[in-house]
Amino acid sequence: MRILYGVQGTGNGHLSRARVMAKALMEQDIKVDFLFSGRKPDQYFDMQCFGDYRVQTGMTFATHSGRLNLPQTVRQNLSLSLMKDIQALDLSCYDLVLNDFEPISAWAARRQGVPSIGISHQAALIHPVPKMGNTWLNELLLMYFAPVDVALGCHWHHFGFPILPPFVEVVPCSSEHTHQILVYLPFEDVDTIASFLAPFSDYLFLVYHSQQPQVQTAKHIQWYGFNRDGFKQHLASCGGVIGNAGFELASEALTLGKKLLVKPLIGQFEQLSNVAALQLLAAADSMMTLDINVLKRWLKAASPNPIAYPQVGDTLVKWLRGGDWHHSQPLCQELWAQVALPDTWR
């Protein structure tokens, strides 16, 4: 079996899931080529596990000050290059296309009649799971942005549907620094973040961001450019996580038993829906703006117990090899049977 794996590059969560799958596919001797789209080639990092991967433009989302900028998103994606890339992608040597919300490989597979399986958090939102900010446009986006023959979604809870657990790979840590807080708010302005954290000098905030403040900030706020290994180590040892409401970081925090405070990207349906799910499960605190009062209460909160999600990638690859791709319920049941969910989630 030879597979093309298309991955949406706009979010690090897609890349994290692809890393888990790359390892599982390699261990089971399946030939796989990776195609990434959605960000510039020089903005990918720690990509060694993907071998000789390809990068194409694809589609991406524009943001400003913690909000989705829909007009700018439309403007920057109005291009004939996407259609040309879809038409130019030759899939004749592949038996299957795996897809994590990546439009070029998805539409090329549909045009050429190659079987395709979607593995993404977005695919879980096709089911009536908790949602917020949903519109007919969002429903169209879920169905047609990266259409596939079989859609396998992943979520923190199955909610009674054939959904996979999260794909999580975390660094274990023997010691926890309860007064160290990991902060990852990539869509927020750095000066706004600094002002938000400034009053809480009893804590050490480890802030990962692509930019640095123009003026020196307080000593209890440390700034880091994104480094995957350093981020994983800080995530493992911190006492809590403040982030946007992306799926993967929240999954890692839940797996490690870290208290979680999320601020969604306003206007982004997936992140708003993640907030709805976290609220229903009582798994995190949330804020729609960087609210100092919410932060003050959250810092005093206790940490939850960790959730031991299974190694989804290994089981999924075995299922892929079996070839019965239109029957995913047994796969999902097998994986969730290994998860001890909190009593309050049941």
Language-model segments: what does each one mean?
Residues 296-346:
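C-terminal amphipathic helix plus adjacent low-complexity
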Residues 14-26:
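Short amphipathic alpha-helix
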Residues 8-12, 27-79, 290:
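Conserved nucleotide-sugar phosphate-binding/catalytic loop shared by glycosyltransferases and other
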Residues 97-103, 108, 234-273:
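A donor-sugar binding/catalytic signature common to diverse glycosyltransferases
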Residues 22, 167-171, 175-240:
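Donor-nucleotide binding loops and adjacent catalytic segments primarily
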Residues 127-189, 207-211:
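A nucleotide-sugar donor-handling region in carbohydrate enzymes
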Residues 67-96, 101-104:
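Conserved nucleotide-sugar donor-binding subdomain of glycosyltransferases
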Residues 250, 254-304:
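Catalytic binding pocket for nucleotide-activated donors in carbohydrate/polymer assembly enzymes
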